[in-house]
């Protein structure tokens, strides 16, 4: 079992049980107690749990403190579920934009599995790897500065390059969404990228799993009135739907 799979099983177990002993985690993942200790140390450093004598307790860390690798396994099933709904909005032959973020990776995998003739513009290096391996699409990568921690390109040059293209559909993964502030992001260097993709796109689809709603991050991206469609998973907090509808935003979730 690879490390990320072990991390996911540990986090899901702690979400359900709140605590776990070293031996319980060792049995869960089929590894030694020494391996468990190393895994718990990394997860604690990422803010996902707190180590205690003989085990660990769950800690629901703020997403701004989580590393990209940890974010990539958090709510993975929800992300995979929601991207299945993109099929109603993307047509083969279109030009599509994908921004940085872990949900964008799942979106890229969905596109690779279901389409043949897309042109994809992305500043997400992880998405680029998915697309390059598939060898199916025309892929456009804007220039700029690389953020190695996020695996994403940013900067004025990146934003200018994006604005050179006419994008049919921008698929925009977001990190926080509230009625008070709209879309916000903890990644200061990515807000301008999202804005550029919005400006260049005819259709804007925001993708966010259920954990992103009711949160506010430090950087403003756009208001609710600038949104058209949100895709979320089956655990979407339904108490948010009436307000989105009243403000002209469609919320698409699995039936």
Where are these regions (language model features)?
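Conserved phosphate- and dinucleotide-binding cores of soluble alpha/beta proteins
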Residues: 2-12, 19-25, 30, 78, ...
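Hydrophobic/small residue at the entry helix of a nucleotide-binding pocket
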Residues: 103
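HTH-adjacent hinge/linker in prokaryotic transcriptional regulators
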Residues: 2-29, 34-100, 109-119, 132-137
């Amino acid at each position: 079992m690879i490390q990320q799979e072990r991390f996911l099983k540990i986090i899901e177990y702690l979400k359900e049980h709140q605590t776990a002993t070293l031996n319980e985690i060792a049995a869960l993942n089929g590894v030694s107690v020494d391996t468990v200790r190393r895994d718990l140390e990394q997860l604690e450093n990422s803010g996902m749990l707190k180590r205690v004598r003989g085990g660990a307790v769950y800690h629901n860390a703020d997403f701004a403190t989580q590393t990209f690798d940890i974010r990539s396994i958090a709510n993975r099933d929800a992300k995979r579920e929601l991207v299945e709904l993109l099929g109603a909005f993307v047509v083969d032959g279109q030009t599509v934009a994908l921004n940085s973020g872990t949900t964008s990776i799942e979106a890229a995998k969905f596109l690779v599995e279901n389409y043949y003739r897309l042109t994809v513009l992305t500043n997400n290096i992880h998405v680029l790897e998915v697309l390059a391996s598939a060898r199916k699409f025309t892929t456009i990568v804007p220039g700029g500065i690389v953020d190695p921690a996020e695996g994403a390109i940013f900067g004025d040059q990146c934003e200018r390059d994006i604005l050179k293209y006419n994008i049919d559909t921008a698929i925009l993964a977001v990190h926080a969404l509230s009625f008070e502030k709209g879309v916000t992001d903890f990644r200061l260097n990515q807000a301008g990228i999202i804005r550029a993709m919005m400006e260049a796109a005819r259709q804007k689809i925001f993708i966010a799993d259920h954990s992103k709603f009711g949160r506010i991050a430090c950087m403003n991206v756009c208001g609710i009135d600038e949104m058209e469609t949100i895709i979320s998973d089956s655990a979407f907090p339904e108490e948010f739907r009436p307000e989105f509808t009243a403000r002209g935003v469609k919320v698409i979730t699995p039936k």
